[in-house]
């Protein structure tokens, strides 16, 4: 059977009914569950297996039976490890039914079907005597996320110890330690606050209003692959310090709320703007088997790992890769100026049942620091990458150069299209006679209204719909301007909604009106990822266990529910270029409704496995052949085949992952079909050996 789903098309801006199989949501959940990423984490798998072998052997030597409970078994991999290590009984639970059904088949295929009791429930719903015959004395689980406690580990462990485990039960992992490092980073700070927008001479055009300056921001973590943050982009103000321990093994309840006040000394002067955060886990009771999520500069095994990889590997790329446990940035509500090395200050560290937050102060706080929230609309409306993009100086300079060269004081009448377009507001500060700002989003509009009021801009009018514009307003326009950026956009070309809006008013615009950007080009680049491709790559076997049934399930679901191109922040995921970029679509916004059907081939100029195709948009501001008239969402430096690509850090690019990448390929064949009226933009890729 099929059903119809209400889907927003980002290019047309219209909701439409889309026919989908009635199991579409199931396939979407399976394809995006993230189990494959964990199974490609060889360090995690090896160390969990080693901890199980060591712990079970130790319990045996002590004359104890071993009854294992595996919470959130997924594929059943940890349960099979426990069986292999000699457990007397293994009970596994998995509440996600598609995964539980797959685990049942995997267990049978690996000869463990009759050795593992599989319960299709959450662990908090299990009853001893009804679901499992006895309490377990060994708990193995992977309940952690980047924040450590964000998936509810505290509550799950507390319930397990109270209801499902014996008094002397051991746990794998046994305990976790959380770390913080205070740092200054003008680059990372751009993801959190709004800077003054200045003209090309450095004179301020738009100042952030007081409510933005005083806003403490959102306490939510900003999860990133911290090792990929350039070392030149931050100044560590302290060494890493341990802030919390979580003992998963103790019978006593783990506290749901704690606070820790640390007195630290700065290593060098700077502004305490943010906290880098990560954790490690001791998988065995003795603490000998350690898995660290530290960035490379703080990793306890950096020297050994670097020696294994060799000198041709940058240090940032030598650590075992994982995307399910990363590092995080927490932004300090009010940055603290540390004027000299050795300056003492206080770091307040807090956690509740699911999250953490931090503050830095010169004087010790007299009461508990509450979790802060956004009060200015900026943080609650825009993503971290969009906030950074608004602040991106090199990008802004190209737009401002266009505006300064084209806006005539008291003569220009400008229509601005897009969400949160501060650069459009800058045309008012540059002296435009009038600025019509299309801003239908309530919170984004409220933010821009506060900026208009604070900067005393008198000639700005807000619009909900471009269709509401009077003929007299449209005929007076001299410029239509956009970045473009729209809140519904996920992939870079979703911002082609700019063309859709233009089409609605095109016939009523004067012939002399200047439209910027005038065109957009999509580029494709065949690449070899070091690791990112693993999120879609089949697992095959893991620690000697056959997981091909899992691969088949995920592949079936991915074919049903996963787009051929997905959005990723590629600066976090190193890749080498295998060729130069090639244009695969050119859209002129003056003739936006024209359909395109294109084909081509890219010759690979560097040996390697093409396990990804990166795609992005270049926006052409004016019709001139100058790099200064292009704003790119792709590489920030020229692409050289065989070298790592340096990507724009404030936007996500599109990525296509070939289903079965192979070596020896000489050409990447591509086709593009674009039907703008329908909002359909489809790519296909094939690998060929000539």
UniProtKB/Swiss-Prot annotation:
Question: Which EC number applies?
Answer: 2.1.1.-
The SAM-dependent MTase PRMT-type domain is annotated at: 14-357, 366-690
Domain of life, per lineage? Eukaryota
* Keyword entries, A-Z: Methyltransferase, Repeat, S-adenosyl-L-methionine, Transferase
Q: Name one GO molecular function term.
A: protein-arginine omega-N symmetric methyltransferase activity
Q: Which InterPro entries match?
A: Arg_MeTrfase (IPR025799), MeTrfase_PRMT7 (IPR014644), PRMT_dom (IPR055135), SAM-dependent_MTases_sf (IPR029063)
**Which Gene Ontology BP annotations are present?**
peptidyl-arginine methylation
SUPFAM superfamilies under this entry? S-adenosyl-L-methionine-dependent methyltransferases
Main role?
Answer: Essential arginine methyltransferase that can both catalyze the formation of omega-N monomethylarginine (MMA) and symmetrical dimethylarginine (sDMA). Specifically mediates the symmetrical dimethylation of arginine residues in the small nuclear ribonucleoproteins SmD1 and SmD3.
Question: What does the sequence similarity comment in the record state about its family?
Answer: Belongs to the class I-like SAM-binding methyltransferase superfamily. Protein arginine N-methyltransferase family. PRMT7 subfamily.
Q: What is this protein called?
A: Protein arginine N-methyltransferase 7
Gene name of the encoded protein = Art7
């Amino acid at each position: 059977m099929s059903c119809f789903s209400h889907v927003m098309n980002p290019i047309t801006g219209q909701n439409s009914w889309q026919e989908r199989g009635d199991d579409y949501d199931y396939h979407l959940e399976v394809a995006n569950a993230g189990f494959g990423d964990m199974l490609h984490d060889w360090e995690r798998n090896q160390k969990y297996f080693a901890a199980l072998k060591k712990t079970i052997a130790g319990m045996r030597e002590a004359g104890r039976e071993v009854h294992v409970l595996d919470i959130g078994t997924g594929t059943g991999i940890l349960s099979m490890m426990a069986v292999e290590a000699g457990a007397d009984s293994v009970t596994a639970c998995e509440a996600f039914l598609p995964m539980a059904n797959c685990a049942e088949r995997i267990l049978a295929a690996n000869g463990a079907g009759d050795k593992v009791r599989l319960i299709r429930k959450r662990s908090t719903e299990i009853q001893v005597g009804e679901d499992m015959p006895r309490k377990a004395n060994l708990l193995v689980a992977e309940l952690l996320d980047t924040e450590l406690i964000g998936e509810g580990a505290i509550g799950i462990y507390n319930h397990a110890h109270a209801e499902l485990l014996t008094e002397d039960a051991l746990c794998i992992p046994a305990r976790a330690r959380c770390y913080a490092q205070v740092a200054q980073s003008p680059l990372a700070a751009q993801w959190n606050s709004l800077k003054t927008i200045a003209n090309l001479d450095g004179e301020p055009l738009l100042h952030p209003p007081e409510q933005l300056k005083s806003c403490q921001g959102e306490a939510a973590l900003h999860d990133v692959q911290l090792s990929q943050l350039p070392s030149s982009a931050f100044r560590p103000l302290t060494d890493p310090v341990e802030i919390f321990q979580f003992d998963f093994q103790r019978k006593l309840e783990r506290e749901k709320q704690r606070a820790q006040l640390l007195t630290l000394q700065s290593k060098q002067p700077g502004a305490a703007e943010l906290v880098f955060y990560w954790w490690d886990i001791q998988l065995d009771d003795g603490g000998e088997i350690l898995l660290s999520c530290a960035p490379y500069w703080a990793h306890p095994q950096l020297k050994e790992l670097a020696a294994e990889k060799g000198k041709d590997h940058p240090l940032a790329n030598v650590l075992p890769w994982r995307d399910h446990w990363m590092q995080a940035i927490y932004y300090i509500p009010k940055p603290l100026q540390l004027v000299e090395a050795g300056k003492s200050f206080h770091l307040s560290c807090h956690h509740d049942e699911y999250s953490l937050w931090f503050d830095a102060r010169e004087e010790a706080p007299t009461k508990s620091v509450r979790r802060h929230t956004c009060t200015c609309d900026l943080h609650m409306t825009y993503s971290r990458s969009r906030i950074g993009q608004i602040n991106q100086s090199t990008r802004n300079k190209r737009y401002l150069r266009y505006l300064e060269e084209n806006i005539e004081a008291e003569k220009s009448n400008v229509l601005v299209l897009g969400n949160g377009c501060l650069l459009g507001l800058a045309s008012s500060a540059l002296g435009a006679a009038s600025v019509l700002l299309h801003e239908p989003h309530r919170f984004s509009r409220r933010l821009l209204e506060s900026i208009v009021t604070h900067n005393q801009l008198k000639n700005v009018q807000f619009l909900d719909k471009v269709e509401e514009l009077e003929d007299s307003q449209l005929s007076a326009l001299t410029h239509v301007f956009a970045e473009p950026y729209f809140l519904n956009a996920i992939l870079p070309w979703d911002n082609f909604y700019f063309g859709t809006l233009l089409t609605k008013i095109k016939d009523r615009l004067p012939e002399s009106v200047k439209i910027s950007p005038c065109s957009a080009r999509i580029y494709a680049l065949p690449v070899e990822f070091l690791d990112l491709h693993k999120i879609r790559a089949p697992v095959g076997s893991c620690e000697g266990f056959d997981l091909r049934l899992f691969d088949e399930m995920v592949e079936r679901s991915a074919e049903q529910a996963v787009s051929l191109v997905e959005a990723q922040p590629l600066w976090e995921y190193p890749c080498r270029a295998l060729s130069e970029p090639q244009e695969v679509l050119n859209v002129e916004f003056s003739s936006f409704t024209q359909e395109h059907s294109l084909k081509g081939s890219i010759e690979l100029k560097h040996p390697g496995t093409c396990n990804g195709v990166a795609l992005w948009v270049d926006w052409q501001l004016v019709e001139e052949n100058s790099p200064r008239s292009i704003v790119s969402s792709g590489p920030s430096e020229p692409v050289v085949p065989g070298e790592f690509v340096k990507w724009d850090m404030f936007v996500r690019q599109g990525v296509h992952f070939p289903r079965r990448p192979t070596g020896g390929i000489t050409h990447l064949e591509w086709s593009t079909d674009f039907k703008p009226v329908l909002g359909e933009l489809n790519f296909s890729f094939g690998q060929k050996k000539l």
